[in-house]
């Protein structure tokens, strides 16, 4: 069975416009042979074939006639495939994603006769639609994107990536999967599903920020479900572990917040270690990155600003060191840094960063901005935790 994004493309082309986005609309051919990556047109894991336009293997057997991402002409692909000369910021990406989302919902309209069947859950509990169409109709409009550098340009592709096999022809250090927001709340608000038997509101994401290490990436790293509660008549969010739905309370959220902070401190401390060093960050047996689903849900819900802060902080401090192959973890400095953060959370004591950025450090000129931005990021996370009046994320 194809993933929901590919099924969406199939029904998009079959019921709306056969040239949009120009894939095989006579039924998907059954994939045979070894799967070695994802097709950049349908984003499904499959055996890849060479593109007639560029010669790169980036198309599956069902999409051999589709456009090449290096030569975009049709309207749909212009919205979902972007190219930039320089690294785009989040504001630019958000503007493009809004245009992509608006165009998608205008064309793949859930109010049309075919799509509307999914909304009539109360009158049609048996829901007699074939599985492929159900998957197509349930595709989430996530703000997930695939980003890579090729021929000196930055390529952004919006879509739902649900596999750990990305592209064999790309250097992994140039590849990133990112998110502009967590859930497709706008579309969820239109759905009238009152029972969880058909999970139209599931956003399944591999939760990868950047692939630079040897950590195995698991297909089911993160599953998040938004659902309407019949009793409270409001939205609730839960992490899915097997068949269990796990709501996250305020108390647990605070525990995960402290745990996540400690993890960020750990990875900052080892941010300049080489993959071949004896640093525990690269030790397969430790598997610190193989976090629980609940931890990943929390990280995405509350930790975005703090994670971004540590990424920038690592760049500021790491860019002023020679590239080395030894572990540079400084236990005393990180312990002092950790204590500063805990004192700020518990007592409101200002963070100085003196333990990790001494005055002679080249990054010290950014010290005021770094201090203020870290405290603001922590404040934002704490305010979200304390505002959970429903008791769940």
Curated annotation (Swiss-Prot):
Source species, domain of life: Viruses
Keywords from the named record: Host cytoplasm, Host cytoskeleton, Host-virus interaction, Inhibition of host innate immune response by virus, Inhibition of host IRF3 by virus, Inhibition of host IRF7 by virus, Inhibition of host RLR pathway by virus, Interferon antiviral system evasion, Metal-binding, RNA-binding, Viral immunoevasion
Region (RNA-binding): 2-79
Residue ranges, annotated region (Important for cytoskeleton localization): 80-170
Subcellular location: Host cytoplasm, Host cytoskeleton
InterPro entries: Rotavirus_NSP1
Protein role: Plays a role in the inhibition of host innate immunity by inducing the degradation of key host factors required to activate interferon production such as IRF3, IRF5 or IRF7. Associates with components of cullin RING ligases (CRLs) including CUL1 or CUL3, which are essential multisubunit ubiquitination complexes, to modulate their activities.
Family: Belongs to the rotavirus NSP1 family.
Domain notes: The integrity of the zinc-binding domain in NSP1 is important for degradation of host IRF3.
Protein name: Non-structural protein 1
């Amino acid at each position: 069975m194809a993933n929901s994004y590919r099924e969406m493309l199939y029904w998009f082309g079959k019921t709306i416009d056969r040239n949009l986005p120009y894939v095989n609309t006579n039924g998907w051919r059954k994939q045979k042979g070894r799967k070695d990556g994802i097709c950049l047109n349908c984003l499904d894991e499959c055996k890849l074939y060479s593109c007639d336009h560029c010669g790169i293997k980036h198309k599956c057997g069902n999409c051999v006639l589709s456009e090449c991402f290096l030569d975009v002409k049709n309207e749909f692909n212009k919205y979902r495939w972007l190219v930039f000369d320089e690294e785009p910021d989040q504001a630019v990406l958000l503007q493009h994603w809004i245009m992509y989302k608006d165009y998608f919902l205008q064309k793949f309209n859930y109010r049309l006769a075919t799509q509307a069947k999914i909304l009539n859950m109360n009158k049609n509990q048996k829901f007699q639609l074939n599985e492929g169409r159900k998957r197509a109709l349930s595709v989430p409009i996530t703000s997930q994107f695939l980003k890579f550098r090729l021929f000196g340009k930055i390529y952004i592709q919006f879509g739902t990536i649900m596999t750990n096999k990305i592209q064999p022809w790309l250097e992994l250090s140039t590849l990133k999967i990112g998110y502009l927001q967590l859930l497709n709340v706008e579309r969820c608000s239109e759905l009238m599903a009152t029972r969880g038997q058909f999970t139209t509101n599931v956003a399944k994401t591999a939760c990868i920020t950047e692939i630079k290490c040897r950590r195995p990436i698991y297909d089911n790293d993160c599953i998040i479900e938004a659902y309407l509660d019949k009793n409270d008549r409001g939205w609730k969010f839960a992490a899915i572990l097997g068949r269990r739905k796990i709501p996250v309370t305020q108390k647990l959220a605070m525990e995960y917040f402290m745990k996540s902070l400690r993890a960020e401190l750990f990875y900052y401390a080892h941010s300049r270690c080489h993959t071949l060093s004896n640093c525990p960050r690269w030790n397969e047996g430790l598997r610190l990155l193989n976090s629980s689903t609940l931890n990943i849900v929390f990280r995405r819900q509350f930790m975005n600003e703090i994670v971004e802060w540590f990424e920038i902080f690592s760049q500021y401090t790491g860019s002023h060191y020679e590239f080395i192959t030894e572990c540079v973890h400084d236990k005393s400095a990180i312990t002092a840094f950790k204590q500063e953060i805990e004192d700020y959370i518990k007592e409101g004591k200002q963070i100085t960063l003196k333990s990790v950025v001494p005055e002679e450090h080249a990054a010290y000129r950014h010290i005021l901005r770094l201090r203020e931005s870290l405290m603001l990021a922590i404040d934002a996370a704490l305010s979200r935790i304390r505002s959970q009046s429903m008791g769940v994320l």
